[in-house]
């Protein structure tokens, strides 16, 4: 799209669009609505809100902020990179401190959206392709996690982690499904989110190694908050209340979750159908921004994400 505007005009428009999309994503420091909204909605509503609708924010950054205002995006990139890194670490630490399962999953999304924004504004083909793939993978992973947490809450009548324990002894299939969804959320190799998160970190490393290094800490924190929740809710001896109220997944519930888990596994092993679509668009966007901002920002990075990872 060919547009002619003054520098100040472009920057003000970029800031307006960026703030709006950052709220929608959400991204630190305009993220505060998400945990409260997730806590006070139904699991199905949380899936729609976080797994689907919030992608409008990050997609808007990709399609509008970068494409319409490339010079302003380049001008604002240092600040956005810092905010993205803060969002990644803050979201992970906040998730680690939660006792409410819905708020915990919501804060994991704050961290994940930080990764997406980091990848977009690192502006390398690998990082942008990783960020775009992250939007898709996060939607599947978070949908599965919210639904399974919702099934637990529906049965027990409580959102508090401390009210559970020993669920795997009374509902082993539910516990197994939750383990897979949780491992995908912490980006375990072999599951779809790993490829996108690795792409973001690898692509960011070539331009902002400090940001990539700090963000990698969140992968360790993710292991802590996911496995902490799993250990406290699924392992140990079930209380009399858990034995009485928590039952195994129904067949209908299983058939809702199974396709999501299957996609996480299939695209974790064979992401080519997605990367073949996303890589060219990422390369085109990065090339457009580089041409608009001048040769000093050009990158020699040749490719993006393939079946074997980022190259």
Describe each PLM feature range.
Residues 41, 171-174, 226-311:
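Cytoplasmic/organellar membrane-interface segments at the starts of transmembrane helices
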Residues 1-232:
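Hydrophobic transmembrane alpha-helices and their helix-loop junctions in integral membrane proteins
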């Amino acid at each position: 799209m060919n547009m002619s505007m003054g520098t100040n005009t472009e920057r003000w428009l970029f800031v307006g669009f960026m703030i709006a999309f950052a709220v929608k994503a959400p991204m630190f420091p305009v993220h505060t609505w998400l945990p409260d909204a997730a806590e006070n909605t139904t699991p199905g509503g949380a899936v729609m809100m976080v797994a689907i609708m919030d992608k409008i924010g990050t997609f808007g950054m990709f399609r509008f902020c970068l494409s319409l205002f490339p010079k302003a995006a380049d001008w604002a990139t240092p600040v956005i990179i810092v905010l993205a890194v803060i969002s990644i670490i803050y979201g992970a630490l906040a998730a680690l401190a939660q006792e409410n399962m819905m708020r915990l999953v919501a804060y994991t999304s704050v961290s994940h959206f930080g990764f997406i924004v980091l990848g977009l504004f690192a502006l390398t083909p690998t990082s942008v392709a990783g960020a775009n793939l992250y939007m898709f993978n996060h939607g599947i992973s978070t949908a599965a996690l919210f639904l399974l947490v919702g099934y637990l809450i529906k049965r027990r009548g409580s959102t508090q982690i401390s009210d559970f324990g020993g669920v795997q002894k009374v509902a082993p299939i539910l516990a197994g499904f939750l383990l897979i969804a949780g491992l995908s959320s912490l980006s375990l190799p072999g599951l779809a989110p790993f490829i996108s998160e690795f792409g973001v970190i690898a692509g960011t490393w070539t331009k902002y190694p400090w940001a990539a290094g700090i963000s990698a800490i969140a992968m360790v924190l993710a292991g802590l908050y996911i496995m902490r929740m799993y250990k406290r809710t699924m392992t140990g001896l079930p209380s009399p209340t858990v034995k009485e109220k928590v039952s195994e997944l129904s067949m209908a519930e299983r058939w809702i979750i199974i396709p999501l888990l299957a996609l996480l596994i299939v695209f974790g092993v064979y992401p080519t159908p997605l990367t073949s679509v996303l890589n060219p668009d990422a390369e085109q966007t990065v090339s457009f921004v580089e041409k608009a901002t001048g040769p000093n920002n050009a990158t020699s990075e040749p490719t993006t994400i393939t079946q074997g990872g980022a190259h």
